[in-house]
Amino acid sequence: MDVLVILKVFPESDEINLTQLSEEIKKRLPEGYRLVKNETEPIAYGLKALIAYIQMPENTEGGTDKLEELVNGIEGVSHAEVVNVTRLGF
């Protein structure tokens, strides 16, 4: 069974292209993970966060920590945090 992780990604500056950032996240996702969709959310002073909806296996060792570490390691990312996790399917 899979879960849907909603991840809020804060860029280092307002000059970071969020579309390119989303593509970089998509490229780096491990096997079994999938970027379902993304959107932007205004934060302050013209800065926007990327909201990434990522499907991943529920029984992943380390849970969402591995995903946060992966995204936090991408150039241009200030930090990323899990906003919500929900189980997919019944």
From Swiss-Prot:
It holds the Pfam family EF1_GNE. InterPro entries: eEF-1beta-like_sf (IPR036219), EF1B_bsu/dsu_GNE (IPR014038), Transl_elong_EF1B/ribsomal_bS6 (IPR014717), Transl_elong_EF1B_B_arc (IPR004542). The keyword Zinc-finger does not apply. It comes from the Archaea. Keywords: Elongation factor, Protein biosynthesis. GO terms for molecular function: translation elongation factor activity. SMART domains: EF1_GNE. The keyword Protein biosynthesis applies. HAMAP family: EF1_beta. Promotes the exchange of GDP for GTP in EF-1-alpha/GDP, thus allowing the regeneration of EF-1-alpha/GTP that could then be used to form the ternary complex EF-1-alpha/GTP/AAtRNA. Belongs to the EF-1-beta/EF-1-delta family. This is Elongation factor 1-beta. It comes from Sulfolobus acidocaldarius (strain ATCC 33909 / DSM 639 / JCM 8929 / NBRC 15157 / NCIMB 11770).
